[in-house]
Amino acid sequence: MPASRTVRLIRLGCARNDVDAEELAARLVDAGWRLTEAPSADVTVVNTCGFIEAAKQESIDTLLEAADGSTRVVAVGCLAERYGAALADAMPEATILSFDDYPVIAQRLEDVLAGRPPAPHTPRDRRTLLPLTPVDRPRAAAEVGIPGHLGGPRVLRHRLDDSPVAPLKIASGCDRRCTFCAIPSFRGAFVSRPPADILREAQWLADHGAREIVLVSENSTSYGKDLGDPFALEKLLAAFGGVDGLVRVRVTYLQPAEVRPALIDVIATAPHVAPYFDLSFQHASPRVLRRMRRFGGSEEFLNLLAEIRRRNPRAAVRSNVIVGFPGETEEDVAELGEFLRAARLDGIGVFGYSDEDGTEASGFPEKIPEQEIRSRVDDIAGIAEEVTADRARARLGETVDVLIDGVDDDRPDACYGYTEVQAVDVDGVTVLRDCSAARGALVRAEIVEIDGVDFLAAPVTGSTAGTPSGATVEG
């Protein structure tokens, strides 16, 4: 291959997609491709998102924008996997690749440049690629080619940024059948990665600049159910204490109905685990949740929150909710609002319902008009803003560990970063005044001021206690 071959990788969507993009980057670099951010690259690969309508539109807009230049455009990721040939027909400007093409991505791009792009795939339900019985899946998964699941002594990953925070995939797919969600159809059945592979990748990430690792999957509380160990996630989290160079690990995508006491204990109390619970409540009305084919309701969720805070009153809780689900009444919306006020969550994402192709809910009657959905979203988002701001104010005076990510653009004498109760990209940030710490440093500080959900903090002098994995805290 000529040395001049260049490729631009554009990442859209969630942290799981970021992991997949870094696998693609590693494969391309291994094959001699040079990564660039220039729009004039020989090929632009867009790692698309296909989750909800807004994300799909962003992916399409990004593909069209890239196609305006001289570069060849290739679509990978969830939108490409989900729609395949139909997307190719609608968008002849781009070559559409499947997850199955990832192991041979370099050859596929060579074919595109040579004028022989591969024929687009016909989408299939990827749940059918693995056995129905979970314990039979890990061995079969090696033959399927699941993105981000490679094992072996060498980590196939190339970091695309120098952030001190890095995502790490512990599982893929989902066995739940939520009526609003299409993800299992194109991400497949749930399958866990072996703990040894995860820990090897964690050490590699730490060796390449990561100080905090964020564990991602479609459903992290199911981790290990196919490995024959109901406490596999608890053991995995404990094992991260032995990864040299890490200051903390954060676990995301927890299903409330699957959260167990032992898991609460390790997340709430282990010194190297962020006391942070990312719980996908989705709603609070039991009636709406049943139609979503989910479990629980206000009472069960509040009991779970009480148990978390009994173990660690400082623990942070984040969740997402869907407003405007078919059949949702004004009483259901009121119950959701009351729940959010009582729950005192640290972070809340509010989404308006939209029909997704192939989902059960898309065929439900009693659809809510779009204008009414927007109105309900505005109402719940207003409550969410009040609740999260109140929760942030309650942290005034707390001592936290701030992982420094950079220098504040508005204040050269200040740094910004994230505490143990703030996840990068989805929660607020902490601005640390009078700070000269380097990126990746962990600084003990006191929260002295609140701005919405953001913290202003001051370093605590003379404090260096309590850091995991041999790391130091500056103060």
Curated annotation (Swiss-Prot):
It comes from the Bacteria. Residues 393-461 form the TRAM domain. The keyword Transport does not apply. The keyword Cytoplasm applies. GO terms for biological process: tRNA modification. It holds the Pfam family TRAM_2. Residues 160-390 form the Radical SAM core domain. Residues 5-114 form the MTTase N-terminal domain. Binds 2 [4Fe-4S] clusters. One cluster is coordinated with 3 cysteines and an exchangeable S-adenosyl-L-methionine. Its EC number is 2.8.4.4. It catalyses: L-aspartate(89)-[ribosomal protein uS12]-hydrogen + (sulfur carrier)-SH + AH2 + 2 S-adenosyl-L-methionine = 3-methylsulfanyl-L-aspartate(89)-[ribosomal protein uS12]-hydrogen + (sulfur carrier)-H + 5'-deoxyadenosine + L-methionine + A + S-adenosyl-L-homocysteine + 2 H(+). Its main location: cytoplasm. This is Ribosomal protein uS12 methylthiotransferase RimO. It comes from Acidothermus cellulolyticus (strain ATCC 43068 / DSM 8971 / 11B).
